[in-house]
């Protein structure tokens, strides 16, 4: 919906970072445009240098992956200078802020937040689109309901689908939002306890800035034994997640990259997401950390 709102000419080029869930790039394809995959920096967010080397794009999907803010201010300024539409895929980033202390999801022409079950707040499935542009807003209101005319009759402006929330989901969402500050506090508690208990010469705990909120606490291995570590932790009943596979490694997306993406590929082989549910207790973190420290 956010990509459709831009009303770009079909086949327009839209940049997307190599490290993101396929939903980000699928939105570009579904809207009839051409993705341009670019590399990421060490913080796992989109690389401005890589973007500058890519084909000229009409829009950019910026992803503050795992709550990391990246070089968002420079990206925003570059998009403004080059007249590139900016969409934020802030699925992971509710509760995080950018270096200018603006909330993730507040600097783009449009922004998207996810409410799937494992996000900081949930409505079961779905999400929301944010914008302060009245044209985009009015389009979104129509397109979410079969592109129905403004008088809500059974006449339609054109093609549209049903993207509406159910009343039940909305009720759950309102309740979840009322608990957001508590969820943020729990995320910070978990982050602090990992910082106090993890210590190993085989990996580093990724540090988050004060204005950033981790979706998952993350370690960076000093070698490429990530599969061995995942299997070891699994044998101890500790579930972990690797990063999303780089987009260019998906067979149906391999043709959408024409810049070097070495950094994102190396990151995929070294970074691991740790258990970070808001219900995780300090005792459970102690067990996870001691197990990791013994690896």
Model-predicted segments: where are they?
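Histidine-centered beta-alpha loop that forms part of the nucleotide-sugar donor binding/catalytic region
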Residues: 19, 33, 40, 64, ...
């Amino acid at each position: 919906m956010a990509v459709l709102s831009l009303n770009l000419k079909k086949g327009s080029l839209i940049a997307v970072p190599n490290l993101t869930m396929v939903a980000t790039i699928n939105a570009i394809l579904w809207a009839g445009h051409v993705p341009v995959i670019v590399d990421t920096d060490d913080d796992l967010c989109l690389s401005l240098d890589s973007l500058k080397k890519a084909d000229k794009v009409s829009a950019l999907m910026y992803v503050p992956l795992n709550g990391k803010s990246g070089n968002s201010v420079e990206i925003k300024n570059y998009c403004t200078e080059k007249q590139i539409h900016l969409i934020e895929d802030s699925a992971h980033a509710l509760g995080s802020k950018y270096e200018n202390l603006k909330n993730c999801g507040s600097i783009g022409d449009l922004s998207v937040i996810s409410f799937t079950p494992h996000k900081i707040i949930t409505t079961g499935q779905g999400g929301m689109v944010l914008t302060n542009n009245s044209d985009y807003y009015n389009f979104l209101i129509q397109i979410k309901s079969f592109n129905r005319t403004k008088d809500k009759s059974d006449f339609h402006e054109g093609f549209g689908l049903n993207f509406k929330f159910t009343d039940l989901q909305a009720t759950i969402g309102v309740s979840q939002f009322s608990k957001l500050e508590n969820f943020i506090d729990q995320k910070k508690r978990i982050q602090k306890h990992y910082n106090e208990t993890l210590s190993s010469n085989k990996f580093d705990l990724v540090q988050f800035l004060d204005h950033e909120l981790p979706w998952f606490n993350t370690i960076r291995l000093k070698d490429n034994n990530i599969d061995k570590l995942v299997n070891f932790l699994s044998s101890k009943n500790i579930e972990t997640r690797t990063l999303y596979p780089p987009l260019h490694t998906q067979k149906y997306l391999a043709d959408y990259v024409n810049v070097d993406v070495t950094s994102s590929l190396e990151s995929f082989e070294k970074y691991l997401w740790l258990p970070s549910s808001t219900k995780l207790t300090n005792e459970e973190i102690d067990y996870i950390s001691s197990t990791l420290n013994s690896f």
